[in-house]
A protein has these predicted regions:
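HTH-adjacent hinge/linker in prokaryotic transcriptional regulators
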Residues: 2-7, 16-22, 28-30, 35-100, ...
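Short, active-site-adjacent cap segments at secondary-structure transitions
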Residues: 58, 103-106, 132-133, 183-184
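Generic beta-structure capping elements
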Residues: 60-62, 101, 147, 179-180
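Conserved phosphate- and dinucleotide-binding cores of soluble alpha/beta proteins
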Residues: 2-13, 17-26, 31-36, 45-46, ...
Length: 261
């Protein structure tokens, strides 16, 4: 039986494949009562993740538009664990770039705790995410740079040609990116054209590239590819990929870090 925090993510993966799921189907898949499923359906509709209709949960047509709030509720515990592990890769003296996704945001929260505890003497952080900036409390050791550009209120981030022009002179020891899908054929991909382009730009200025993604993204592809497998240094996730993808990652010399849960 899936844990409570995993059920929403599981149903979202079903909707992504089939477009709909009934109460009875979800009850059998999740191993919970029909009443529990109906409550879950209601919560998902209230969050804008899906639409209820006559005992069936359907994909929300507007759900193709990314929402930071809605995405934060899917695989939330897994994202927290991934974020905590990823934050441990940051070292004193680093110049890092933080992407705008919800999993990287969890990393930002964990990194903020490390900064507050006095672990760093010098740290430079560049990000296109407004929520990342808000999560990082001012500290004398930390220089924080928010890049400008076209603001997306749903994503709470900046992107576009001006953002890429701003990024161009920088050099990063490490960049930490999210993704909406990763598979052998398409590599790492995003559902947003501007973010995909920005990620490619950032990677070109980075010594090491870390991708943070929960297990629902493994084996899938999104709209725009931004990197082949061999362009990534480390992937941090919560579960083992399927054998074919794991083999492809190993062949591409991508280091796989599992946070377990």
């Amino acid at each position: 039986m899936l844990r409570k925090n995993e059920r929403t993510g599981y149903l979202m993966s079903i909707l992504k494949r089939t477009g709909h799921v009934t109460v009875s189907e979800a009850s059998e898949m999740l191993g919970v009562s029909g009443a529990t499923v109906r409550r879950l359906f209601a919560q998902m509709e209230e969050s804008g993740l899906a639409i209820r209709s006559h005992g069936t949960l359907r994909s929300n047509p507007s759900g193709s538009v990314y929402s930071f709030e809605a995405s934060s509720q899917v695989y939330s515990k897994e994202k927290q664990n991934i974020g905590r592990m990823a934050a441990m890769f940051v070292e004193d003296g680093d110049i890092i770039y933080l992407d705008c996704g919800t999993t990287v945001f969890q990393m930002t929260l964990a990194l903020s705790q490390r900064i507050a505890s006095g672990e760093f003497q010098s740290l430079n952080i560049v990000t296109n995410s407004l929520v990342n900036v808000q999560a990082l409390n001012p500290d004398p050791c930390c220089q924080l740079i928010l890049v400008g550009g076209i603001y997306n209120s749903e994503r709470r981030d900046f992107s576009g040609p001006l953002t890429e022009k701003f990024i161009a002179p920088f050099h990063f020891n490490k960049c930490f990116l999210g993704c909406d899908g990763v598979n052998q054929r398409d590599g790492f991909s995003s559902k947003d054209v501007n973010i995909s382009s920005l990620n490619s730009c950032v990677m070109g200025r980075s010594d090491a590239v870390y991708v943070l993604c929960d297990s629902s993204k493994l084996g899938h592809s999104s709209m725009v590819s931004y990197a082949p497998l061999d362009r990534i240094t480390v992937i941090v996730t919560n579960a083992e990929p399927e054998a074919d993808l794991r083999s492809a990652l190993q062949s591409a010399n991508v280091h796989l870090n599992l946070c377990g849960g």
